[in-house]
Amino acid sequence: EHKNNLRDILPDASDKLVSAIQNCEEARKRAEEELEYDIRYGIEPIPMNDDRYPQRLKDCDDAPLILFYKGNANLNQQRVINIVGTRHCTPYGEDLIRRFITDLKQLSPNVLIMSGLAYGVDIVAHRQALANGYETIGVLAHGLDDLYPRQHRETAARMIEQGGLLTEFLTRTNADKINFVRRNRIVAGMSDACIL
């Protein structure tokens, strides 16, 4: 139907031009759906030209043009560290993270702690940050309409109140393997230091 309308308006247009115009219409519709969802669920789209966009990330060549954020932490906090590692954290690793964050709180109480909300080191870091009164940001490898892994929903809900969830991905984006790699560049790009 749409193609026929375009043919009426542009009878001499090539199939390639008609297809390009239709793709623009589909993209506009998808953007409207995304914004409606974001408004309904309190998600903030933060374009790169917004003051809230992480300044450190702007310095990266492959920084996303837009981020989607749900939370209350300042993404441009003076000190930001990320804590990442294996998805199979040992009791020794858990204790090391707990002691590190507890000691860090004594030395520098205003640090934003970031990770990827994954199993293992990531979730331990987020939970210890919350337990020590730190704001913590989980950078996701999918849209904010879902959560992977689902077992971390309770922690993620607490993080929204004491930090937040951040992604470059639109809703309805699956947690595909390549997205975890893309997610990691945001975690690294926003941080002053990485604890691995």
Regions found by a protein language model. Give the residues of each.
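Short, small/acidic-rich helices and loops at N termini and domain boundaries
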Residues: E1-R52
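Glycine-biased, small-residue-rich flexible motifs in mid-sequence functional cores and linkers
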Residues: E44-L196
